């Protein structure tokens, strides 16, 4: 279904896939001596407002705040607890304040971030969300290119490429040993109506959308999914501005910026570029179908089998993808980060 998409949109999907693979590779192979960063204040500080984020320093003595872990500012990963090992208990702060040789080396920690967990639990989930929502956008746009209205009629795709049409034709030819074309003829009629609606849409888009609420809802859903996917893509650049940016190498930050800039450029090109008209594209109606009892049986069987086959394939793909994701994601997560307290 996605093979009929615009080259620009498929390129964006490819960029998201490549960046997801790069993020997984770095998360699994990064040799971080200590994956944590800490928001610290001096031992004499009365509050945590002036906290400063810094990487782990073996010469520093880290201590809990006086009112315990409730003041902690943890990230979204759920694995920041691993950063709170071998700290001085808050009950010992009074003793440390009176030790001149340790006074300047004590830091009160008011926040922690597990930077490896951030990549896995936040950054990668954001990329995955963008990938899934972008696929949803491509599917919605594909359906509109097959059957829906467009102001630019060069966006049209031939309805003969519709999945159920192909499945119906294949089943009728291979299983029933006959030619079934009524579904194709129905799609051709829908194509003619699409052309008429598109002319009205081009002439008066606002009036058309006000008159056709279903078209407004579907086009709004398509635009909304595209917008959300763009937001998630741009949101991945927050990696550069998080406290963890101190611990990440420069090439990871450049990759994050390069990914967002590349997707933005491709999206701008897709907006500016006007799809040229297709040359020599003509859809001839297929040969008439067989009439009578045989034609009726062929029609019913082909339609039912095509729908069942299509739904079964989609269901198996979804179940398989979700099963693989849950199985391996849990194993890798536990191997990398350990058990989460929030799970």
Swiss-Prot record:
Q: Which InterPro entries match?
A: GK
Provide the Gene Ontology terms for cellular component.
host cell endosome membrane; host cell Golgi membrane; host cell plasma membrane; membrane
| Residue numbers on the Extracellular membrane side | 32-118, 235-251, 325-343
* One Pfam family, short name: Fusion_gly_K
Which of the residues are on side Cytoplasmic? 140-213, 273-303
Name the UniProt key words of this record, in alphabetical order: Glycoprotein, Host cell membrane, Host endosome, Host Golgi apparatus, Host membrane, Membrane, Signal, Syncytium formation induced by viral infection, Transmembrane, Transmembrane helix, Viral primary envelope fusion with host outer nuclear membrane, Viral release from host cell
**For this UniProt entry, what is the primary localization, expressed as one broad class?**
host cell
| Example GO biological process | fusion of viral membrane with host outer nuclear membrane
The portions of this protein that span the membrane are: 119-139, 214-234, 252-272, 304-324
Domain of life where this protein originates: Viruses
Q: Where is the signal peptide?
A: 1-31
What processing steps or modifications follow its translation? N-glycosylated.
| Compartments where located | Host cell membrane; Host endosome membrane; Host Golgi apparatus membrane
Question: What is the membrane topology listed in the Swiss-Prot or TrEMBL record?
Answer: Multi-pass membrane protein
- Give the positions annotated as glycosylation sites: 57, 89
How does the annotation summarize its subunit structure? Interacts (via UL20 interaction region) with protein UL20 homolog (via N-terminus); this interaction probably plays a role in the coordinate transport of protein UL20 homolog and gK to the trans-Golgi network (TGN), and is required for the cell surface expression of gK.
Tell me, what does this protein do in biology? Answer: Glycoprotein that probably modulates membrane fusion events during secondary envelopment of cytoplasmic capsids that bud into specific trans-Golgi network (TGN)-derived membranes.
Family stated for the protein in its record: Belongs to the alphaherpesvirinae glycoprotein K family.
Protein name, per record: Envelope glycoprotein K
Specify the species. Equine herpesvirus 1 (strain Ab4p) (EHV-1)
Q: Which gene encodes it?
A: gK
């Amino acid at each position: 279904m996605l093979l009929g998409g615009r080259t620009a949109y498929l390129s964006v999907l490819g960029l998201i896939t490549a960046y997801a693979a790069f993020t997984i590779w770095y998360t699994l192979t990064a040799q971080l001596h200590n994956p944590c960063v800490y928001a610290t204040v001096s031992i004499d500080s009365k509050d945590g407002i002036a906290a400063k984020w810094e990487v782990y320093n073996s010469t520093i003595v880290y201590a809990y705040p006086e009112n315990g872990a409730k003041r902690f500012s943890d990230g979204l990963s759920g694995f920041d607890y691993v950063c709170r090992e071998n700290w001085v208990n808050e009950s010992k702060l009074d003793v440390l304040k009176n030790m001149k040789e340790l006074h300047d080396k004590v830091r009160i920690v008011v926040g922690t971030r597990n930077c490896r967990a951030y990549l896995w639990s936040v950054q990668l989930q954001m990329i995955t969300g963008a990938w899934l929502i972008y696929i949803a956008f491509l599917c919605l746009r594909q359906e509109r290119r097959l059957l829906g209205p467009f102001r630019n009629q060069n966006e049209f795709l031939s309805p003969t490429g519709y999945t159920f049409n192909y499945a119906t034709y294949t089943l009728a030819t291979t299983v029933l040993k006959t030619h079934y074309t009524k579904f194709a003829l129905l799609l051709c009629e829908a194509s003619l109506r699409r052309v008429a609606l598109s002319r009205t849409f081009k002439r008066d888009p606002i009036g058309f959308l006000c008159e056709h609420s279903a078209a407004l809802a579907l086009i709004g859903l398509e635009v909304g999914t595209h917008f959300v996917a763009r937001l998630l893509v741009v949101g991945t650049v927050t990696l550069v501005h998080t406290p963890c940016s101190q611990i990440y190498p420069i090439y990871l930050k450049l990759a994050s910026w390069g990914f967002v800039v590349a997707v933005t450029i491709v999206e701008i090109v897709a907006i500016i570029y006007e799809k040229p008209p297709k040359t020599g594209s003509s859809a001839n109606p297929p040969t008439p179908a067989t009439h009578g009892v045989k034609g009726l049986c062929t029609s019913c069987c082909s339609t039912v089998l095509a729908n069942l086959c299509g739904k079964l394939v989609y269901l198996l793909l979804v179940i398989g993808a979700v099963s693989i994701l849950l199985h391996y994601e849990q194993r890798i997560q536990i191997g990398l980060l350990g058990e989460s307290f929030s799970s």
